[in-house]
Design a protein with these regions (language model features):
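A conserved acidic beta->alpha catalytic loop
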Residues: 31, 48-58
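Short, well-formed alpha-helical segments that are part of the catalytic scaffolds
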Residues: 21-36
């Protein structure tokens, strides 16, 4: 991040959603700012805090005061707009308004680490070389070096009917990767949807799609819906081969994850209805049967496994709500 550049010289803004994961946030901010300090382009950071109560907001304010050259802006959520999608949309709108010459929006989460500036430089070069690409993500790994998923193919009704575990066993979620290509020393390929951890987005594509659909996809599947809408407009998604990008929550689940299984089913149903058609309603009897089988299995398991009791309650909830689109 070049401190000599004023706001008019900022070309890239990193957007971070923060909610009650201070230890991860500290690591994410530290590695990001360290990488950006060596960048040849002007940059800034906008953090949306969704109501953290673990000291995250206080850490951010102290960091901003102690590091003014890092161009760190903080947005505190209002009570009625605290979802993940709201946070990204609000922060991106603020970034564009605050830095009018911004060309790139870098969606970066608290469980990300950027080890150096090279991945970002490659992503910018690739998007400049390939004008049909809306965004570029990276092959990512955990802190221990193990591979972590970076994207997936657009989901089918079959994969939804089978459930996440069985669909994964059948390889129905694997990215539909193209062959690897090389452009200006950058090894990359495409797939349907690239996750937002992290993701460099072309401003033009973001504005054309009007960002995330926060009303229908406040949390899960918002990135899939956005990628699908991009594809319908002719945009593509790229993955860049990299060894320098981390995606690892270190087993610290966000408070946003508390109702994940129900949210997943509700949003996946909406996603498939929007992009695959109204025939998704024909799956309801199949989904009801699946939830019934899951309920029976969890009921037996809950006798010896206390953790299964909460899962059982969620399955019972889905049994009741599947007929009303999980609402």
């Amino acid at each position: 991040m070049n401190p000599s550049l004023d706001q008019s010289g900022v070309e890239l803004v990193a957007v971070i959603n923060s909610f009650n994961r201070r230890s991860l946030l500290e690591r994410a901010i530290t590695t990001l700012t360290s990488a950006l300090q060596s960048a040849q382009f002007g940059s800034a950071i906008v953090v949306f805090d969704a109501g953290s109560e673990d000291g995250s907001l206080e850490f951010l304010k102290a960091w901003r005061e102690n590091n003014p050259a890092h161009n760190l802006a903080i947005i505190e959520a209002t009570s009625d707009r605290r979802s993940f999608s709201d946070g990204v949309n609000i922060a991106c709108a603020d970034a564009i308004a605050r830095f009018p010459k911004t060309r790139w929006l870098f969606l970066y989460e608290t469980d990300n680490c950027l080890l150096n500036i090279e991945p970002l430089e490659k992503a910018i070069r690739l998007l400049n070389l390939e004008p049909q690409l809306a965004a570029a993500g990276f092959t990512v790994k955990k802190h221990d070096g193990t591979f972590f998923g970076y994207g997936m193919r657009f989901p089918s009704m079959l994969s939804f009917a089978l459930g996440q575990n069985l669909a994964a066993l059948c390889n129905l979620h694997s990215p539909n990767n193209s062959a690897w290509r090389n452009s200006d020393g950058i090894r990359w390929r495409t797939c349907d949807a690239v996750f937002t951890s992290p993701l460099l987005i072309r401003r033009q594509a973001w504005e054309q799609t009007t960002g995330f659909d926060a009303e229908n996809f406040p949390f899960s599947d918002t990135d899939l819906d956005w990628a699908w809408r991009c594809a319908r407009l002719g945009w593509g998604m790229a993955i860049i081969a990299s060894e320098d990008v981390i995606h690892d929550n270190l087993e610290q689940l966000s408070a946003w994850s508390a109702n994940r299984v129900v949210d997943f089913h509700r949003n996946r149903f909406r996603l498939l209805k929007r992009h695959r058609g109204k025939q998704i309603a024909l799956l309801k009897p199949v989904l009801f049967l699946r939830h019934g089988l899951e309920t029976l299995i969890l009921k037996r398991r809950s006798r010896v496994d206390p953790a299964a009791k909460e899962k059982l309650a969620k399955r019972k909830q889905m049994l009741r709500t599947v007929w009303s689109n999980y609402s």
